[in-house]
Amino acid sequence: MADPRFYDRLGPLTLKDIAALSGAAISDSGTADQSVDRVTPLGEPVAGALSYAESGKLLRSAPDGALSGVAVICPPDAASEATRLGAAVLTHTAPRAAFASVLPALFQTRSFATDSFIDPSAKIGAGTRLGAGVVIGEGAEIGTDCVIGPHCVIGPGCRIGDRSRLSPHVSLQCSDIGADCNILAGAVIGEDGFGIAVSNGNTVGILHLGSVLIGDHVTIGANCTIDRGLFGATRIGASSKIDNLCHIAHNADIGENVIMAGYSGLAGSAVIADNAMLGGRVGVYDHVTIGEGARVGANSAASRDVPAGEFWVGNPAQPMRQHMRELAELRRLARPKNKTPKKG
């Protein structure tokens, strides 16, 4: 469910409304007036919510009635499976794009409610210092003894823990920051993730309705970008250190005491377990897990899971010893062969 600290609810919408907005077809006309006022991932069904399935494969393993009270947009060939699960069904050849087209009619991110730089409802703890030009939104909460640098923007509902420091020009939206954190200049935290759907050759952006959760004692480097989750949260665990110019995509999950060197990037839903280390310019593919205490060397691309405690390098990344053996073999193959001397 979208956190009301960060999002205004605009619904409800009936299935008839959804069909008009998305171009989807209602499978059973008797459900046309059923309404939804929230959204949910398919694996976490909630009555009165809208969800989507890109194929019937995601539905076949669920028990009968599992989606009772949920409205689901799915491909036409998956309609019978969704009906078996008790869902009110809409069909579309591009369910993700249809779902995306409906979201702005159900929710919007909260805007700055007044013309004041600091909203009267914001709570600012004792001893906290604000630089020139700071903007603080409705319902935001800042702990004690914080330092908020010039021209920082703290969005509605955001929370910042005690003794945290924000350098100039930091932007926070849809985010909770722990205590004793250090966010360096130009970091942008909590903006929309890079969620894209395609329908009939046209791209559709997906409004993200999640948040960013950052634990205590975390450092975020200058000009880092951290996207909020699509449904849930993008997470960074306590005492992790993120270097300058890193990107963390929607729903990435970073554990505690993780180190990411500069220019590293995580794709959506990547998982970095506790005490892992990423060298400079490391890229981690979506849904890939870097195990506890694992290391990935600089300029590597982790396209598959890295087991706990191992050291991987290369593009694609692989265990260090294997990588070095392959390099040695390539060097051997690349050596010029001895030329046979010409005869007399």
Swiss-Prot record:
Residues at the catalytic site: 250 (proton acceptor)
Catalytic activity annotation: a UDP-3-O-[(3R)-3-hydroxyacyl]-alpha-D-glucosamine + a (3R)-hydroxyacyl-[ACP] = a UDP-2-N,3-O-bis[(3R)-3-hydroxyacyl]-alpha-D-glucosamine + holo-[ACP] + H(+)
UniProt-listed SUPFAM superfamilies: Trimeric LpxA-like enzymes
Protein EC: 2.3.1.191
Primary role: Catalyzes the N-acylation of UDP-3-O-acylglucosamine using 3-hydroxyacyl-ACP as the acyl donor. Is involved in the biosynthesis of lipid A, a phosphorylated glycolipid that anchors the lipopolysaccharide to the outer membrane of the cell.
GO cellular component terms, A-Z: membrane
Entry keyword annotation includes rRNA-binding: no
Gene3D superfamilies in alphabetical order: Hexapeptide repeat proteins, MurE/MurF, N-terminal domain
Top EC class for this record: transferase
Stored InterPro entries: Hexapep (IPR001451), LpxD (IPR007691), Trimer_LpxA-like_sf (IPR011004)
Organism: Maricaulis maris (strain MCS10)
Subunit structure: Homotrimer.
Gene Ontology biological process terms from the UniProt entry: lipid A biosynthetic process
Family, similarity comment: Belongs to the transferase hexapeptide repeat family. LpxD subfamily.
Official protein name in the record: UDP-3-O-acylglucosamine N-acyltransferase
Keywords from the named record: Acyltransferase, Lipid A biosynthesis, Lipid biosynthesis, Lipid metabolism, Repeat, Transferase
UniProt-recorded Gene Ontology molecular function terms: N-acyltransferase activity
Pathway note: Bacterial outer membrane biogenesis; LPS lipid A biosynthesis
